[in-house]
Amino acid sequence: MTDYCYPKAKRLLKPAEFKPVFNQPLFKVHQTHFMAFAYDSDHLQARLGMAITKKKIPTAVARNTIKRIIREQFRHTHAQLPALDVVFILKKSTKALSNEQMRQEISDILSKVISKQRRATAADVKHKDK
């Protein structure tokens, strides 16, 4: 059975944990409203960080809704995610989006993270074989 909890071990909490993700990302995944940075983690499981700014989303209620949706999608796909640190940022306002549209965009990003990491891992294996 899959563990759907979201303990502190699965979160990026300190600025020092966010810094390498932003400065040296393994890759980035773009969508219309969101962007995710992925960094190869030393941890055994994927960890999530969020940088949802007041400048893009002025109300706390809206920011918290976005964070809740990101956390929920992360929890449901965590089992498939490789050991990466993933940080979500907001590219532009989500006022025009419904919660379902946000879920879909975030889910698409997480799917792309999984496929990009698999391709990168497969490429590493090919280079080691040569």
UniProtKB/Swiss-Prot annotation:
Query: What do we know about how this protein assembles, alone or with others?
Result: Consists of a catalytic RNA component (M1 or rnpB) and a protein subunit.
Query: What Pfam families is this protein classified in?
Result: Ribonuclease_P (PF00825)
Q: Name one GO biological process term.
A: tRNA 5'-leader removal
Q: Which GO terms describe its cellular component?
A: ribonuclease P complex
Query: What function is annotated for this protein?
Result: RNaseP catalyzes the removal of the 5'-leader sequence from pre-tRNA to produce the mature 5'-terminus. It can also cleave other RNA substrates such as 4.5S RNA. The protein component plays an auxiliary but essential role in vivo by binding to the 5'-leader sequence and broadening the substrate specificity of the ribozyme.
What the entry lists under SUPFAM superfamilies is as follows: Ribosomal protein S5 domain 2-like
Query: Encoded by which gene?
Result: rnpA
Q: What is its EC number?
A: 3.1.26.5
As for family, the record states:
Belongs to the RnpA family.
Catalysed reaction(s) here are:
Endonucleolytic cleavage of RNA, removing 5'-extranucleotides from tRNA precursor
Origin: domain of life: Bacteria
Write the record's keywords in alphabetical order, separated by commas: Endonuclease, Hydrolase, Nuclease, RNA-binding, tRNA processing
The record's annotation in InterPro entries points to: Ribosomal_Su5_D2-typ_SF (IPR020568), Ribsml_uS5_D2-typ_fold_subgr (IPR014721), RNase_P (IPR000100), RNase_P_CS (IPR020539)
NCBIfam families listed in its UniProt record? rnpA
| Name of the protein in question | Ribonuclease P protein component
Query: What GO molecular function annotation could you give as one example from this UniProt entry?
Result: tRNA binding
